[in-house]
Regions:
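Acidic/polar, glycine-rich intrinsically disordered N-terminal extensions of enzymes
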Residues: 1-120
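Helix-rich catalytic cores of soluble enzyme domains
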Residues: 114-238
Length: 238
């Protein structure tokens, strides 16, 4: 019984293909607003100037299909010490769980009193997450608020990095600090892409907007060979 793994299937292959076809139609006929100048220039070269109107880019189906086929089918994720942890994609892939994410307050376990989230809370929560055997990763647990505001992401990410070895799902609140955080990790660890254990987490703006901060952070992560999570969550009425 310990080997029983439930499987939840929400859509048939035909329904998935239908959704994909409608998505391709929206991208080709409506397009996406791209706020990043560097990404906009790259897309102009790919789709042609006739498919770009100011910041609105219409993306042809064949380009999307090419991108899907070119993407790696599997990504091996490691821990900070270089030990393989799990593979994303492939026939044996399954749902993964991690602790998180980005609390502004910490509820004191002895008194239930909410207090501002501090470095010590990040340190303790990351250590707890690393001891939980059924959790595969540790996300950015909170936003530390006992340091200068412009250094929040630096201190929080440092505590996240040094207090655990599990794969790290990273959320950096200040888009201008993301590259600084990556450079800090490289100083501490070296090449981040050789055996990736950091998975940056991004939220573009719904619907059909690729905002500058998100796109530029994605570019920084991808150029380092890191897998990313793009959580383009749905919005009522969008």
């Amino acid at each position: 019984m310990n080997n029983v793994r439930p499987k939840l299937s929400m859509l048939t292959e035909e329904q998935i293909q239908e959704i994909h076809d409608h998505t391709m139609n929206v991208l080709e006929t409506v397009g996406v607003r791209v706020d990043s100048p560097s990404a906009l220039e790259m897309l102009k070269k790919k789709v042609g100037a006739s498919m770009v109107n100011d910041r609105l880019v219409k993306i042809p189906r064949e380009l999307v299909e090419w991108a899907i086929k070119s993407a790696p089918k599997q990504v091996q994720v490691y821990d900070r010490r270089g030990k393989p942890q799990f593979t994303v994609g492939g026939p044996e892939d399954r749902i993964r769980f991690g602790i998180g994410v980005t609390a502004l307050y910490y509820q004191e376990p002895d008194t239930d009193t909410p207090v501002l989230f501090e470095r010590k809370h990040m340190r303790d929560m990351v250590r707890v997450g690393n001891k939980l055997p059924h959790y595969d990763m540790v996300s950015t647990v909170g936003i530390v608020r006992d340091v200068p505001e412009h250094l929040t992401d630096m201190y929080g990410s440092l505590e996240h990095f040094v207090n655990g070895v599990k794969p790290l799902v990273l959320l950096v609140s200040d888009e201008h600090k993301f590259n600084d955080v990556m450079e800090m990790f490289e100083t501490l660890h070296g090449d981040l892409g050789e055996k990736p254990f950091i998975i940056p987490y991004f939220n573009p703006v719904s619907p059909l907007v690729m905002n500058e901060g998100t796109v530029d952070k994605m570019k920084i992560a991808i150029e380092r060979g890191l897998p990313v999570i793009v959580s383009n969550y749905s919005m009522s009425g969008a």
